[in-house]
Regions:
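Extreme N-terminal tail/first-helix region
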Residues: 1-26
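A glycine-rich, hydrophobic loop/mini-helix early in the fold
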Residues: 27-53
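Short, contiguous alpha-helical
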Residues: 2-11, 45-89, 118, 130-167
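Acidic/His metal-coordination segments adjacent to aromatic residues that form catalytic metal sites
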Residues: 15-17, 52, 92-105, 137-145
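Acidic/histidine-rich alpha-helical segments that form the ligand environment
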Residues: 23-35, 93-130
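Residues that cap or delimit alpha-helices
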Residues: 17, 40, 125-126
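Compositionally biased, intrinsically disordered low-complexity regions enriched in proline and serine
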Residues: 9, 14-16, 99, 111, ...
Length: 167
């Protein structure tokens, strides 16, 4: 049974605990680079189980998720209370051929998008962190919540990558 949007949010926030989401996000790119630096191309493309993403697919997903996060934050800043559309990550993975993506190029894209997002987050006033949008599945989400979700999402996928590399 698939978890609900609220169950997902609760589970994923557990990875972040009391850590600063901006610091976690700032550290992610280097950690990902270290994790994949010595992995072979075949290891990066190997699915750990049927229907589970390879490291290459995870990296492509992380890069695309940064685009989504970037848009959501900017949309909220431009029009607080704006609707936030959900996206189907599996449909994106299929439509954009994540399985065929170059993992190192995906990491490069992720790094570029992440840097832009961190620059924006660091420029926000305390009041802007409270601006919110209305997520189609999860309801009201502030920029602060989006930053926490993004950091938690990083930690979730890094655990997956570490597990795949240890197999």
């Amino acid at each position: 049974m698939q978890e609900t949007a609220q169950e997902y949010k609760q589970r994923i926030f557990g990875y972040l605990a009391q850590n600063d989401p901006v610091k976690v996000q700032a550290a992610t790119a280097k950690k990902l680079g270290r994790l994949i630096s010595r992995a072979s191309a075949s290891k990066l493309r190997k699915q750990p189980a049927p229907g589970k993403w390879s490291i290459s697919e995870i990296l492509a997903h992380l890069a695309d998720t940064e685009v989504v996060v970037s848009y959501r934050i900017r949309a909220i800043l431009g029009a607080p209370g704006t609707p936030i559309q959900a996206f189907d990550q599996d449909k994106w993975a299929q439509a954009m051929s994540y399985g065929k993506s170059d993992p190192r190029r995906s990491l490069e894209r992720f790094i570029a998008f992440r840097k832009a997002n961190l620059d924006l987050l660091k420029s926000l006033s305390p009041g802007q962190w409270k601006y919110h949008g209305m997520h189609a599945e999860r309801g009201e989400e502030s920029i602060e919540t989006i930053a926490k979700l993004s950091a938690s999402h990083d930690l979730n996928h890094m655990r997956q990558i570490e597990k795949i590399l240890s197999q």
